[in-house]
Amino acid sequence: MLRRSLIFLVLLSAGCVSLDPHYSTPESPIPATLPGAQGQGKAISHDWQQVIHDPRLQQVVTIALNSNRDVQKAIADIDSARALYGQTNASLFPTVNAALSSTRSRSLANGTGTTAEADGTVSSYTLDLFGRNQSLSRAARETWLASEFTAQNTRLTLIAEISTAWLTLAADNSNLALAKETMASAENSLKIIQRQQQVGTAAATDVSEAMSVYQQARASVASYQTQVMQDKNALNLLAGTTLAENLLPGTLESLPEQMISLVPAGVSSDVLLRRPDIQEAEHNLKSANADIGAARANFFPTISLTASAGVGSDALSSLFSHGMQIWSFAPSVTLPLFTGGSNLAQLRYAEAQKRGLIATYEKTVQSAFKDVANALARRTTLEEQLDAQRQYVKAEQQTVDVGLRRYQAGVGDYLTVLTAERSLWSAQQELLALQLTDFTNRITLWQSLGGGMSSLK
């Protein structure tokens, strides 16, 4: 009978009212279309393994996803939120305990007697007539789901950061190689001009200029050697372990342009809603909405039921053989008459929290739009800049070649050659910077559009 009663009570609570406010996703405070986007309709979700094509970088990303401490903490936060949801959800069901009790009493008139009693089940349950426990359960579930998207966003950010760090190392390897090449050339030029000065065909200012170029290149070599070591340290920190040398990149020029795919952005700003940070913000908002329902329910009576059933005997030895059946049922009603304004304060707090989270959601959407807009704006001029810079490097190389031929023919001075070589070096460095920007812009665009989720779960 007790079992049937408990089932009835659970079904009764399942049909209780909810005092949660009606929830609707806030309207996105952004334009309907992305500025500078190409193509039709919505962007296609690209898994990171479909965007990154270098097998070394793919392996580095996989290692990082398994070993990075930020990811591990995010996973632990998911487990914590899931456990809290399970704890909160348990309040929707009765608690049933088994109990064994024994009492001993002494009578001055009749001597000593012993009574033993065992309660087979003791159950307590709070009828959720106004949906308070249901609201708390929904709030905990939404918090758990928000933590899932927090972890996805952590993984997405990690992929972008470690890819950028890997490419930065490649760029600094290129800069180091270029600085060494420039230093060797400048050292050779310095020796030539020093010999010319000894025979009176070069001025002291020519030697000083050549020395300046050489020392500048020498300082750059030392600087880039330090930078390369720091790049490796940053990469190892993101990976969560020391990476093998065969997983590290060579120079940036050795990487094909399509090593990082260019993800089409589409034209609709609705694609931003799949970003994990936006989904996290919405689940937090849904949790706050359910908290309002729980706060509203505090104004209504609480009905608690306690029941027990079992057997009893006047001797412990005969308890389980021929004991008497016993039972009890104790309902109670608690009506909040005066709480010193606590319930009203809780409701106002929950409503204020929701307003704040609406603002957070809207700002997250706006920030996402800005991220994509900035990435697309950079993309529109990047190809033209790269082409112009490549032509500039070619022109500077031709200037160096012409200067050398004129010098070798005796109709030009070596100072002109040194000046041209310095300009060429600067142009080559700028080209490397633009090539790195091209790669990182592709990664940023993929990330800002929400990335690919299938391998991040």
Segments and roles (model prediction):
Residues 61, 117-121, 166, 268, ...:
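Membrane-embedded beta-strand positions in outer-membrane beta-barrel channels/transporters
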Residues 200-203, 368, 375, 410-414:
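Alpha-helical heptad-repeat coiled-coil segments that mediate oligomerization/polymerization in large
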Residues 72-73, 89-90, 127-155, 205, ...:
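Sec/SRP-type N-terminal targeting helices
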Residues 1-66, 141, 225-273, 315, ...:
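Terminal intrinsically disordered/low-complexity segments used for targeting and assembly
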